[in-house]
């Protein structure tokens, strides 16, 4: 049997299988530090996410809202609204290092809109971020720096700037301090101006800055002259519906809308109120042209030599219709319009009847707010019941109330060949076809141009004639109506014009709110003395701007109307008598 020798096992290398105490502790510390670093990174990341998404204690959404907001420009590219770099001042109360009482006093001096107690409370609070002044001026920023308080910060915040100041302020509207559009085209165009697809490109309005300035200047002069509480004016392209000017006085500066006193008197709204579309008025005798168009279109007027009895006031039930300046005679169609006879117009409306009168007004849109991009469009005052007297009185603008833009749209259709096109504040592409609704025939439209021209050459609008510009128009004066009650000493005066009448291109409407008579007007305050001069001034200034050069060799043909004009008949009779006497002497 063989013997087996068992060798002893080799000794274990302890240096390779055991960890020294020093190495073990270092490894443990490294792991702990790594975990702490990861945890801190996570906490910081979560905090940043919170600040970016949920926190509102720092600068608000103003900068985010503006971003690449596009400019608003006029039809010729003149900038009306733009975004510029602005700076707001703010403070972080927990970071204040100076004397808080002294700082509160200094802040109250520098920002006096709030009392010193307010700033004491802010500085003692735990609020992390408080605005001191939004859109601060350079002088205010410099003064804040001199306080030497590092807790006061300058926060970059782009702001909306209106380089033309108060011009077209009711059309443009304004933005609030947080960068949110409040009114006007700023509100209507908000999505387009800020969309990624628009990429900050400007949006062109139909407004012509030159025309707008002329309208505002003329209105301002007349408001001051006649101590009126306000005025409104519109210049409308009769073929495209583009509004070249829309003015409302008083005005406000879109750069500082907060400085506008809030109006409390319903008869005297504040400056942010757009009288051209928000106010609805009884527009008086300007409605006579509309009634005549209806009568011609429906065959009630076929013979312009037909005479109507205006020898005495017209009694209808308990109502008595009279003329302001009675002629006390039988009157032809041109005579009724030239002398603005309520009696003659009421008799024509009586032949039209209730149904056709109401239907024509509805066709013109007088029963609903006017169509336009702006909000706050006034609701017309429509008769609750159409009686015979309603038909007669609405024929000369009494008992129905519409906005100035309603009237401008209607007259555009009367003179442009009979088509009503929607009004717009956006520039249309040159030569673009603008669909519309036929209101009257081209033949009727021609007759309306003749009648409007006669009013200016022979009638109540005679002082509005400008050589070579061939203006036509109609005056209108009415008492203000508040809650169904007429304010006898408060007049609204209107002159609506179109030019040139041989080929109309523009309608101009001027409305004066409560003008007062003056020595120069012999105490009179009706449309011929108040609204008409402003419209005449506007047309004289904008005609050449718009390429309409005075030309006395052109005019609309009135030869078939003049024989029915009383003054022309008298002139012809006087001429014939002179010729007869000359022959007798011979």
Regions found by a protein language model. Give the residues of each.
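Conserved, well-ordered alpha-helix/loop/beta-strand core segments that scaffold catalytic motifs
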Residues: 129, 193-231
């Amino acid at each position: 049997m063989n013997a087996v020798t068992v060798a002893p096992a080799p000794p274990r290398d302890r240096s390779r299988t055991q960890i020294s105490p020093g190495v073990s502790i270092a490894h443990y510390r490294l792991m702990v530090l790594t975990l702490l670093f990861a945890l801190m990174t996570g906490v910081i990341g979560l905090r940043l996410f919170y600040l970016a998404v949920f926190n509102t204690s720092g600068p608000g959404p103003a900068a985010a809202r503006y971003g690449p907001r596009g400019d608003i420009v006029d039809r010729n590219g003149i900038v009306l609204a733009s975004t510029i770099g602005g700076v707001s001042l703010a403070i972080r109360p927990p970071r204040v290092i100076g004397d808080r009482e002294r700082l509160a006093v200094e802040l109250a001096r520098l920002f006096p809109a709030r009392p010193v107690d307010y700033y004491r409370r802010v500085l003692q609070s735990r609020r992390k971020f408080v605005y001191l002044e939004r859109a601060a001026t350079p002088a205010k920023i410099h003064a804040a720096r001199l306080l030497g308080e590092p807790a006061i910060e300058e926060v970059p915040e782009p702001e909306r700037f209106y380089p033309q100041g108060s011009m077209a302020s009711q059309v443009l509207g304004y933005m609030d301090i947080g960068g949110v559009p409040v009114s006007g085209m700023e509100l209507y165009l908000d999505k387009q101006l800020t969309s990624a697809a628009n990429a900050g490109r400007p949006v062109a309005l139909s407004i012509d800055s030159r025309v707008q300035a002329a309208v505002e200047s003329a209105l301002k002069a007349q408001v001051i002259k006649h101590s009126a509480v306000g005025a409104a004016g519109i210049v409308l392209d009769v073929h495209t519906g583009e509004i070249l000017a829309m003015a409302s006085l008083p005005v406000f500066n879109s750069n500082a809308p907060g400085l506008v006193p809030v109006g409390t008197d319903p008869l005297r709204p504040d400056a942010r109120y757009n009288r051209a579309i928000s106010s609805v008025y009884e527009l008086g005798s300007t409605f006579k042209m509309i009634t005549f168009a209806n009568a011609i279109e429906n065959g009630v007027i076929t013979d312009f030599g037909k005479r109507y009895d205006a020898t005495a006031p017209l009694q209808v039930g308990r109502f008595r219709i009279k003329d302001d300046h009675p002629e006390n005679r039988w009157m032809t169609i041109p005579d009724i319009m030239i002398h603005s006879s309520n009696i003659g117009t009421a008799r024509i409306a009586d032949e039209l009847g209730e149904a056709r009168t109401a239907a024509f007004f509805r066709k013109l849109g007088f029963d609903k707010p006017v169509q336009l991009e702006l909000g706050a469009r006034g609701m017309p005052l429509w008769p609750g019941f159409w009686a015979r007297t309603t038909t007669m009185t609405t024929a000369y603008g009494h008992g129905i109330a519409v906005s100035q833009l309603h009237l401008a749209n209607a007259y555009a259709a009367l003179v442009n060949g009979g088509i009503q096109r929607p009004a717009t504040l956006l520039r249309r592409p040159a030569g673009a076809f603008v669909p519309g609704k036929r209101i009257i025939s081209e033949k009727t439209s021609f007759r309306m141009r003749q009648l409007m021209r006669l009013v200016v050459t022979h009638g109540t609008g005679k002082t509005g004639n400008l050589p070579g510009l061939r203006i036509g128009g109609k005056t209108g004066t009415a008492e203000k109506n508040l809650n169904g009650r007429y304010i006898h000493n408060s007049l609204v005066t209107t002159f609506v014009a179109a030019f040139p009448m041989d080929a109309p291109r523009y309608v101009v409407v001027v409305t004066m709110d409560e003008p007062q008579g003056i020595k120069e007007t012999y105490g009179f305050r009706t449309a011929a003395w108040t609204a008409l001069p402003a419209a005449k001034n506007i047309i004289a200034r904008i005609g050449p701007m718009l390429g309409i050069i005075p030309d006395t060799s052109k005019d609309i043909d009135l030869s078939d109307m003049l024989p029915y004009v009383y003054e022309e008949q008298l002139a012809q009779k006087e001429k014939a008598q002179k010729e007869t006497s000359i022959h007798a002497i011979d």
